[in-house]
UniProtKB/Swiss-Prot annotation:
Pathway: Porphyrin-containing compound metabolism; bacteriochlorophyll biosynthesis (light-independent). [4Fe-4S] cluster binds at C126, C160. Homodimer. Protochlorophyllide reductase is composed of three subunits; BchL, BchN and BchB. Mg(2+) binds at S45. Belongs to the NifH/BchL/ChlL family. Keywords: 4Fe-4S, ATP-binding, Bacteriochlorophyll biosynthesis, Chlorophyll biosynthesis, Iron, Iron-sulfur, Magnesium, Metal-binding, Nucleotide-binding, Oxidoreductase, Photosynthesis. Component of the dark-operative protochlorophyllide reductase (DPOR) that uses Mg-ATP and reduced ferredoxin to reduce ring D of protochlorophyllide (Pchlide) to form chlorophyllide a (Chlide). This reaction is light-independent. The L component serves as a unique electron donor to the NB-component of the complex, and binds Mg-ATP. This is Light-independent protochlorophyllide reductase iron-sulfur ATP-binding protein.
Length: 297
């Protein structure tokens, strides 16, 4: 098949953009699937790992898939930087049939299963391909058969076709933000991308998590303007930073009042996502409107 043989859809998913066909055999079934997005450095991996831990505390069988070349998504769950799917595929000259599950799936805190997809070298290849190959491997080894929750932790605020690949599998997208202009600006772009993809895929926006934020006034103002919603608030706690340094989740840290409150918030978030949320239909704002809403007093 050549590019000219592909059907080019029109409309909100990008004028002239090519939709990557998702083979029925590669669809994730039987589990609730969440994709976590947000501005680079906002704490997506910390949020994803603590959310995975919270789901596991609730008795759910959890798989977390890191989709960043840094491959540190599951660092606090496993206590180490685990080999990536792309690395182990290189070791077998890209013959996936030679791989065993223990080559690329690692057990972390409270039984959470951890996979790091990794990524191609800078300036080469496509991250979407790596995500696709990771899901194929998991399906081929039947590693998704007994999973209740899958969490994709996705690279930065990139919204190109490649790193939108997890949206093909996700039921809902969660955006991690902070109570500042740059984070909310990135969230606005992610909302636009997810809403566009939702016209072709099942994914829907769940809401946002205000992370590393003393207050939530700017986030709440944006949500009110765009019909979005805040799902949780994780304050800027030193214990969360220290947990990263200690290679641990928040659920393994000393139990002071702040830590217990943050754990309870993660449990509450996991419970609400598992239970299901009322649908919302948010809209992104033009750049000028974002500046007028948040950029000036």
């Amino acid at each position: 098949m050549s590019p000219k043989d592909l059907t080019i859809p029109t409309g909100a998913d990008g004028e002239g953009s090519v939709q990557v066909h998702l083979d029925e055999a590669d669809k994730i079934t039987g589990a609730k699937v969440f994709a976590v997005y947000g501005k680079g450095g906002i704490g997506k991996s910390t949020t994803s790992s603590n959310l995975s831990a919270a789901f596991s505390i609730l008795g759910k069988r959890v798989l977390q898939i890191g989709c960043d070349p840094k491959h540190d998504s599951t660092f606090t769950l496993t206590g180490s930087l685990v080999p990536t799917v792309i690395d182990v595929l290189k070791d077998v000259d890209f013959h996936p049939e030679e791989l065993r599950p223990e080559d690329f799936v690692f057990e972390g805190f409270n039984g959470v299963m951890c996979v790091e997809a990794g990524g191609p070298p800078a300036g080469t290849g496509c991250g979407g391909y790596v995500v696709g190959q990771t899901v194929k491997l998991l399906k081929q080894h039947h590693l998704l058969d007994d999973t209740d929750v899958v969490i994709f932790d996705v690279l930065g605020d990139v919204v190109c076709g490649g790193f939108a690949a997890p949206l093909q599998h996700a039921d809902q997208a969660v955006v991690v933000t902070a109570n500042d202009f740059d984070s909310i600006y990135a969230m606005n772009r992610i909302i636009a991308a997810v809403q566009a993809k939702s016209k072709n895929y099942k994914v829907r926006l769940a809401g946002c998590v205000a992370n590393r934020s003393r207050a939530t006034d700017e986030v709440d103002r944006f949500c009110k303007e765009t019909n979005f919603r805040r799902l949780a608030h994780m304050p800027d706690l030193d214990a969360i930073r220290r947990s990263r340094l200690k290679k641990k989740t928040l659920f393994e840290m000393d139990e002071d009042q702040d830590v217990l409150a943050a754990r309870a918030e993660y449990i509450r978030l996991a419970e609400s996502l598992w239970r299901g949320l009322d649908p919302i239909d948010p809209h992104s704002l033009p750049d000028r409107d974002i500046f007028e809403l948040l950029g000036f007093d």
